Design a protein with these regions (language model features):
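Conserved, structured core segments of small domains
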Residues: 1-112
């Protein structure tokens, strides 16, 4: 089965303006994803890391990419196709609570 990385974006305002029964259904959906072995978590504070030409590590305590909504969480899921992965994340809190979820196919590099 193929692996996918998902990035959920959303904020508290969008969450709060979503009906409680929809939020509850989304959290139940997340529980079902957990039960299938999906690796899921909320986003902490990011740190950028650079080591240009291997000449020394430089860090910046902030996200590199910018978006209208903050990153809320990440998941690694398995599905037969990207369409199946989309169907899996369509019921998650970020998808239903005025946020958005990106689905990225994970191309696993062979071990060297």
């Amino acid at each position: 089965m193929a692996k996918f990385i998902t990035i959920g974006y959303g904020d508290q305002a969008g969450y709060e303006r979503t009906a409680p029964e929809i939020r509850d259904a989304a959290h139940a959906h997340d529980e079902r994803l957990w039960a299938t072995g999906a690796l899921m978590g909320t986003a902490g504070s990011p740190v950028q890391v650079r080591n240009t030409n291997g000449e020394g590590i430089m860090t910046t305590p902030m996200a590199y990419m910018r978006s209208d909504l903050p990153v809320a969480g990440f998941a690694v899921i398995e599905a037969p196709t990207i369409d199946d992965a989309i169907a899996l994340v369509a019921g998650t809190p970020c998808s239903v609570a005025h946020g958005v979820v990106e689905v990225w196919p994970l191309k696993v590099a062979p071990a060297t």
